[in-house]
Amino acid sequence: KEIMNLIGKGEENAVVVCSLGDASCTEGEVSEAMQMAVLKQLPILYFVQDNGWDISANAIETRAQNIAEFAAGFKGMGIESIDGSDFLLSYQSLQKIIHIIRTERRPFVLHAKVPLLNHHTSGVRKEWYRDDLDKAALDDPFPKLKEACILADISLDTLEKVEKESREDFLSA
């Protein structure tokens, strides 16, 4: 729509967000999409959560490189890798990258390294194929965010209230 001047009301500087898991990036369709995005300089954010796992195989078994390394082969693709378990860093990176995409009208890959805290799918129990559960728990973003809030002088009472309200909102949705 942008290239053909078919932008409608309220769509100025729109950004398309493709949220992907790391294993999906080994599929040909992702490569084709990135190739077209850089060729046409489309305003697309490829937000890749890299937990190092396919459904039941780890990254070492399924790919030669991470998406940031792979995407470097696409001339014109912006790329950034972050610790996705750090909420504040993630938020700041997203703000910066979305600003770049909106102003420069080009694609960008945000590679966020995150822990896999639960089962990958309901049919495959994590205990059956993983030996990294304790390490993954150490990278849980929620305790890190809570600690950052406390360091920013947000009281435990306030945090508990927000948690309770969020849980209630989630359960009632």
Regions found by a protein language model. Give the residues of each.
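Glycine-rich ThDP/TPP pyrophosphate-binding loop and its adjacent helix/strand module
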Residues: 1-172
